[in-house]
UniProtKB/Swiss-Prot annotation:
GO molecular function, one term: rRNA binding
Regions of compositional bias (Low complexity) in chain numbering: 130-151, 161-180, 199-210
Record CDD domains: bS6
RNA-binding listed as a keyword: yes
Record organism: Mesomycoplasma hyopneumoniae (strain 7448) (Mycoplasma hyopneumoniae)
GO biological process terms on file: translation
UniProt keyword list: Ribonucleoprotein, Ribosomal protein, RNA-binding, rRNA-binding
The name this protein goes by in its record: Small ribosomal subunit protein bS6
Length: 241
């Protein structure tokens, strides 16, 4: 079973029980025997506007599927900011300090002033070149991942803004339709009232005209005698010749 070393960075306000419970849940109760808190608290760059955090280091033996489960749970735990998993069977651990090698000071004779200096650099071995190329490839890969992540976030934000704009336009369109419907209903009601009022006025005028006609119409009395007719004719103004 491979041996792993897990470094976790927690929120400075979080408790140690969070990482302790996570390790026990994934790897078992005996997984926290070598769990220890490091003295380092400073961050190389701010995380969530904080420059300090808690560092925890643990060594354990676990299969690959449990490591994947730990990664999944760590990603959904808000208090865990960062984590790093090192396979000690293939890589050097984080708590292993390099040995200080003593350099033998060799006596180099003083160069004569007439000798030409040797400006040729030290030739690099094939393994050093491969290590440098691997480091460069890893840096390029990390840079590409960061660029893709930033591009994905930017596209997501742009899509969210577009969705909000479309929703706002739909709401405005529905509001305009409601306003237009209300305006048309009000106009139709007003027109109907005007038509009704005009009809009523026309009826009043017609009835008034009929009453005036009946008032000034001469009375035709069949029993109108001759004497009254003469009196009526005498009252008429005489036309001048």
């Amino acid at each position: 079973m491979p041996k792993y070393e897990i470094m976790t960075i927690l929120d400075p306000k979080a408790e140690m029980a969070i990482i302790d419970n996570l390790l026990k849940t994934v790897f078992g109760d005996n997984s926290t025997e070598k769990l220890r808190k490091l003295e380092t608290t400073n961050l190389a760059y701010p995380i969530r506007k904080s420059k300090i955090a808690q560092y925890f280091l643990v060594e354990l033996n676990a299969p690959t599927n449990l490591i994947e489960e730990f990664v999944r749970r760590a990603n959904i735990t808000r208090e865990i900011w960062r984590y790093l998993i090192v396979n000690l069977d293939s890589e050097k651990g984080l708590n292993k300090k390099p040995k200080i090698r003593e350099r033998n000071r060799k006596y180099t004779p003083r160069r004569d002033r007439f000798d030409k200096p040797n400006f040729r650099g030290n030739p690099k071995s094939r393994f050093d070149q491969q290590d440098q190329q691997a480091t460069k490839n890893q840096q390029n890969f990390q840079q590409n991942q960061q660029n893709q992540t930033s591009q994905y976030r930017e596209n997501s934000r742009q899509n969210q803004d577009d969705f909000q704009q479309v929703s706002s336009n739909q709401q405005n369109f529905r509001q305009n339709q409601q306003n237009q419907s209300g305006y048309h209903r009000e106009n139709n009601r007003q027109n109907q009232e005007n038509i009704h009022q005009n009809n009523k006025n026309h009826q009043n005028q017609t009835s008034q005209t009929q009453r005036s006609r009946r008032q000034y119409q001469p009375i035709k009395n069949p029993k109108f005698n001759q004497k009254e007719k003469e009196n009526y004719n005498n009252k008429k103004p005489q036309s001048s010749n």
